[in-house]
Structures are given as structure tokens and as C-alpha cells.
Amino acid sequence: MPELKTVGLFLITALAEIAGCYLAYLWLREDKTIWLLVPCALSLVAFVWLLSLHPTAAGRVYAAYGGVYIVMAILWLWVVNGIRPTTWDLVGSAIALLGMAIIMFAPRTT
């Protein structure tokens, strides 16, 4: 069950990062209100705090988190931007998740 908790934490962490970056994007590129920077900052602070909750060495967390981030970004592309992922987007996401699983859940002594 710790694996499920780890993956869930990665998903929430990725959502916080992507949402924060997207809010900044809306302000910078879509000419939306500067007030979007308030939830943007809160989201990015939550992202950093969530990263600190992961139960392994920071470098390993960052490496594995990248795989989950890719999947969440493709999901964001579909849900928020309304662009359906291609087969290659899905294949690449699956490979990234496999890499995350190997990094996080492989047996090790340290």
C-alpha cells in the first residue's frame, strides 16, 4: 500500500505544480488579471511543500516525479486545453510511468 500512497502524493504534487505554472501562463501570455499570481504562488508553495513529504532521497524523488509529471501534463493537455493526446503521447507517458515505478519501487539497500 505504500506504493499507492507514493503515487497519489506524486499526482497531487504534479497537479499543484502544473496549476501554479498555468496560472502564471494565463497572466503572462493570455493577458489575464495579475491577481492570478496569488493562487499561483500558493499553488507553487504547496508544490514545494508536497515534494518535501516524499519518503525517499530528494534526487530519487525528483527523478521519479518527472514520470508522473509527464502523465499529468498530458492529462492537463486533454482536460484543460481540450487537445486529445496522440498515441505517441500515451506511449511516451506509459514509458515515463514505467521509469518512475522502476526508480521508486525497485528493491534497494539505501
UniProtKB/Swiss-Prot annotation:
Belongs to the UPF0060 family. It is found in: Cell inner membrane. The chain crosses the membrane at residues 7-27, 33-53, 63-83, 87-107. This is UPF0060 membrane protein Noc_2955. Coiled coil: none annotated. Keywords: Cell inner membrane, Cell membrane, Membrane, Transmembrane, Transmembrane helix. It comes from the Bacteria. GO terms for cellular component: plasma membrane. It holds the Pfam family UPF0060. NCBIfam families: PRK02237.1 (NF002586). It is a multi-pass membrane protein. InterPro entries: UPF0060.
